[in-house]
Amino acid sequence: MEFSPRAAELTTLLESRMINFYTNLKVDEIGRVVSVGDGIARVYGLNEIQAGEMVEFASGVKGIALNLENENVGIVVFGSDTAIKEGDLVKRTGSIVDVPAGKAMLGRVVDALGVPIDGKGALSDHERRRVEVKAPGIIERKSVHEPMQTGLKAVDSLVPIGRGQRELIIGDRQTGKTAIAIDTILNQKQMNSRGTNESETLYCVYVAIGQKRSTVAQLVQILSEANALEYSMLVAATASDPAPLQFLAPYSGCAMGEYFRDNGMHALIIYDDLSKQAVAYRQMSLLLRRPPGREAFPGDVFYLHSRLLERAAKRSDQTGAGSLTALPVIETQAGDVSAYIPTNVISITDGQICLETELFYRGIRPAINVGLSVSRVGSAAQLKAMKQVCGSSKLELAQYREVAAFAQFGSDLDAATQALLNRGARLTEVPKQPQYEPLPIEKQIVVIYAAVNGFCDRMPLDRISQYEKNILSTINPELLKSFLEKGGLTNERKMEPDASLKESALNL
């Protein structure tokens, strides 16, 4: 007898077969290389590609889609284009460029794509974050109110920086821009050791753009010897790397820093330097045939830096209260701060530290021009004791510079002018500091207190550094601790250090 299923059973059988039907097919959208040269590939056939999407060439080299045109796509190659030729297949990855992030990155040196280049093996447990994300909105932010100490007397007293601030370091080549950044990283060791919980720790990300490999290796050695690598990571796109990697490195470093910001922790990121990133971006844009503007930079070069620096922020209590502080570095040519890129970045940041070649050669190091340097939001984050101590010093320095220019022409100066010149010379001497020797904030307060209150006025200038060492070795440690309290300097506390400061001054 033949089996003849009923219509209803047949329908059910067919439906179940269709539902359970499984195919292991994976569809990739691919295109072909039309032309290639100078690190730019024109690809035909990738109709559904997204802007900023990562693609993979047949040779294994990766690239990013930057120009989406009617006929083809302009792809910037991350690496050498010598293995790519006309007619090669190009595959979409379906993902926007992302990099590894997390505490596993601490102590490591990676390239702009997050691949380790320090020879310590693969990265352990980490998450991946997109390099290009939207900056936090207004509601998600909070005004800057916590100090970020650099350990430099000239910075912490006159141009204070807060957590979540963007403070530009600007100056000619060889004026000590990187030295300020490195000293800031080294100073966090003692600041982190004082923290009672992890939320007070400040992690550091250093992004080296277009620097020599030997310079980066030297920096790693300095941080390693100071045990600063345990809370730091480096992203390096060196001078020998292609322009696209130099363009991408700051965004990659920022994504790594945002991991801490978004998880209720604090991070500091140093971009050294953004002038080289702008040059790399100009090179890419011109090769992509984008219309040039002022100084041959593309029209969106302002947006290049603004979208990067806006990601540095202090988050509100509702969103975790984390912060990302940015110290971008810009190199000027012959002290011209009114050039295109310097003015752009000055207008984006919350202040700038201006370094001058002339001051550097006169032995004033760090070579900070106090008149041009400013911190627009940092004073809200400055310790009360420091604010009380250095309140008058900036005005006195400004008056000193004004009078010193005219004092060269006249010899018969009245007593008040002579006293002003005398005090100004000492206030110029006190902020001098050797490299890689950051000073704790409470010790800075004592030294500046001594200078502002006239304890150094009768002392020869060459004895001031010795006087500083003497007072720091004899001052009461309990008194130093009291300066860190929020109450600031009371009248009783002001009288306390006076005796030991006078005694040290008399000895010299």
Curated annotation (Swiss-Prot):
Subcellular location: Mitochondrion; Mitochondrion inner membrane
Gene3D superfamilies: 2.40.30.20, ATP synthase alpha/beta chain, C-terminal domain, P-loop containing nucleotide triphosphate hydrolases
Domain of life, source organism: Eukaryota
Keywords: ATP synthesis, ATP-binding, CF(1), Hydrogen ion transport, Ion transport, Membrane, Mitochondrion, Mitochondrion inner membrane, Nucleotide-binding, Transport
GO cellular component: mitochondrial inner membrane; mitochondrial membrane; proton-transporting ATP synthase complex
Pfam families: ATP-synt_ab (PF00006), ATP-synt_ab_C (PF00306), ATP-synt_ab_N (PF02874)
Residue numbers marked as site, Required for activity: S373
Protein residues bound to ATP: G171, D172, R173, Q174, T175, G176, K177, T178
Listed InterPro entries: ATP_synth_asu-like_sf, ATP_synth_asu_C, ATP_synth_asu_C_sf, ATP_synth_F1_a_nt-bd_dom, ATP_synth_F1_asu, ATPase_a/bsu_AS, ATPase_F1/V1/A1_a/bsu_N, ATPase_F1/V1/A1_a/bsu_N_sf
Biological processes per GO annotation: proton motive force-driven ATP synthesis
GO MF annotation terms: ADP binding; ATP binding; protein-folding chaperone binding; proton-transporting ATP synthase activity, rotational mechanism
Keyword Mitochondrion: yes
UniProt keyword Lipid metabolism present: no
Cited function: Mitochondrial membrane ATP synthase (F(1)F(0) ATP synthase or Complex V) produces ATP from ADP in the presence of a proton gradient across the membrane which is generated by electron transport complexes of the respiratory chain. F-type ATPases consist of two structural domains, F(1) - containing the extramembraneous catalytic core, and F(0) - containing the membrane proton channel, linked together by a central stalk and a peripheral stalk. During catalysis, ATP synthesis in the catalytic domain of F(1) is coupled via a rotary mechanism of the central stalk subunits to proton translocation.
Subunit structure: F-type ATPases have 2 components, CF(1) - the catalytic core - and CF(0) - the membrane proton channel. CF(1) has five subunits: alpha(3), beta(3), gamma(1), delta(1), epsilon(1). CF(0) has three main subunits: a, b and c.
Family: Belongs to the ATPase alpha/beta chains family.
Protein name: ATP synthase subunit alpha, mitochondrial
Organism in which the protein naturally occurs: Zea mays
The encoding gene: ATPA
